[in-house]
Amino acid sequence: MQTLADLLNTIPAIDPAAMSRAQRHIDGLLKPVGSLGRLEALAIQLAGMPGLNGIPHVGKKAVLVMCADHGVWEEGVAISPKEVTAIQAENMTRGTTGVCVLAAQAGANVHVIDVGIDTAEPIPGLINMRVARGSGNIASAPAMSRRQAEKLLLDVICYTRELAKNGVTLFGVGELGMANTTPAAAIVSTITGRDPEEVVGIGANLPTDKLVNKIDVVRRAIMLNQPNPQDGVDVLAKVGGFDLVGMAGVMLGAASCGLPVLLDGFLSYAAALAACQMSPAIKPYLIPSHLSAEKGARIALSHLGLEPYLNMEMRLGEGSGAALAMPIIEAACAIYNNMGELAASNIVLPGNTTSDLNS
């Protein structure tokens, strides 16, 4: 059985030679150089991922939704009843939530995974990786032990790698858990070094008069638990949550297979920050789907060095933004594989080069 350290060491580097070949190929297509903007850059990024073997393409698609409750809910940082986590998870099994509808539109399968829902019995239809019935209250204790965090990371990495073996080439991450923007803000504040007041937002419509308490809870959680910002596992274990750990595991697992991962919103940015602390090599595999409307989104993305492809003013979570952006990935692959070449049409444009995939 591989350890977490073993798996982190297997993450392959992006192939610069494949990216150079892709650049030359794209520059030789029936268009002025650079005229398809970020779509071209995305195709080149995909070409460099070893799991795609130098040719941007999409096989099976999967959105992995990590569902968990949070002890910090007891601090009054969310207005939704905690039971909504279990109710919505069950709705996901029926295909009626936002991410399920958008994933179906994109032709992606949704994997609903219980990593820490607070119910007496597992919910039928969910993939059971439950660690505990909710995380600890980070305002008064760590979210979980380091051992719990490492085991869940390893379990999710292995699950993700198994999906890749079965033909999934494009992953999306999502989450579900009442009060989970609070630990996400704590992670972002810890790793970026920004004050909680700069990153704490309203989450799922928290009244503005309750925002001061939420900021205070995040500040207390960080002061009490003293997470090490250089240690992603430590941050997740002390001020994170099981859903955040799970998302980090998907990112690490997909990257270990040389495959792309579409981020979702603010929660996924926080998980990505922690995952990048564990292995900076995963960063080229992360594709930001959309700009979350949550307050600390820009701060987190700036620290990651990522610019989202969409700005739809969304803050639903669940993986909805990741599902929505999947057709953009397919569009980047389509232009690479299906457009004609300038040379074949005897067109010469300034700055364009003849396509040569073999050079």
UniProtKB/Swiss-Prot annotation:
Record text on subunit structure and interactions: Homodimer.
UniProt protein name: Nicotinate-nucleotide--dimethylbenzimidazole phosphoribosyltransferase
CDD domains for the chain: DMB-PRT_CobT
Active site per the UniProt annotation: E318 (proton acceptor)
Pfam families with a match to the protein in the record: DBI_PRT (PF02277)
Record key words, sorted: Cobalamin biosynthesis, Glycosyltransferase, Transferase
Family: Belongs to the CobT family.
Role this protein plays: Catalyzes the synthesis of alpha-ribazole-5'-phosphate from nicotinate mononucleotide (NAMN) and 5,6-dimethylbenzimidazole (DMB).
Gene that specifies this protein: cobT
GO MF assignments: nicotinate-nucleotide-dimethylbenzimidazole phosphoribosyltransferase activity
NCBIfam families: cobT_DBIPRT, PRK00105.1
Pathways per UniProt: Nucleoside biosynthesis; alpha-ribazole biosynthesis; alpha-ribazole from 5,6-dimethylbenzimidazole: step 1/2
InterPro entries membership: Nict_dMeBzImd_PRibTrfase, Nict_dMeBzImd_PRibTrfase_bact, Nict_dMeBzImd_PRibTrfase_N, Nict_dMeBzImd_PRibTrfase_sf
Xref: Gene3D superfamilies: 1.10.1610.10, 3.40.50.10210
Highest taxon of source: Bacteria
EC code: 2.4.2.21
Catalytic activity: 5,6-dimethylbenzimidazole + nicotinate beta-D-ribonucleotide = alpha-ribazole 5'-phosphate + nicotinate + H(+)
BP GO terms, sorted: cobalamin biosynthetic process
